[in-house]
Amino acid sequence: HASTASRVHEMLKMRFFDILIASIFLIIACPFFIILSILIWTSGSKPFFKHKRVGLNGKEFYCLKFTSMKGLNEIEEAEQERVIFELDHFGKVNNDPRVTKIGNFIRKTSIDETPQFFNVLKGDMSLIGPRPITKAEMKIYGTKIKSYLSVKPGITGLWQISGRSNTTYSRRVAIDHYYALKRTRRMKIMIMMKTVYVVLFMKGAQ
């Protein structure tokens, strides 16, 4: 019972921290969000898009991002075929022709993911946790999916600071599993500190 009470206490403290940091960030970033939204709008895209992801206990939610790509039908036909092939076979696209000029910048700097602070405020995500996955990706996790579903997905996390795009998917699953089992306060502080370095120097971003 003592360990359960301690775990609940830790969760409440983390929730308070999430709300505090997300609120401060969104207030400060509001003017920047407006400017970036206008720039994306003038490039011919809607500023935001949402995609369904799986979170704590298997609950689905809409994860927010700034739009960084064109639609598939907006690129050349030959490139469309390449994109479809690489997505089907590798799960990602090298030198993706759908990425816009401004999209390339906001992806490299991870700015495209900053609207997820709204997800944190809502309670679907935490500041720290595994990267949110789709329902289709759940099968890749195998038996380790239980550990993924035991925590809230995060804006940053152990995998996100461990190379991100430079790591394999199986490595990502292993890292998410390890974090879910451990997730000590010391580990969370280390993740927050290293996140600043990773974002500033664009390590592992695509």
State each model region's role.
Residues H1-L12, N94, R98, I133:
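Juxtamembrane loop-helix boundary motifs flanking transmembrane segments in multi-pass membrane proteins
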Residues S3-L12, K144-Q206:
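C-terminal terminal-structure detector
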Residues A5-E74, R185-Q206:
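A hydrophobic, helix-centered structural microdomain
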Residues R15, K46, F61, N94-T100, ...:
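Generic recognition of short, well-ordered alpha-helical interface segments
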Residues A22, F49, T100-N104, A136, ...:
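Positions in alpha-helical segments
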Residues C30, T109-D112, I128, R164, ...:
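Residue-level signal for short amphipathic helical patches enriched in basic/charged
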Residues F49-P97, T156-A174:
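Short, glycine-rich, amphipathic interfacial segments at transmembrane boundaries or analogous
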Residues H89-V151, T195-V198:
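A short, structured surface patch at a secondary-structure boundary
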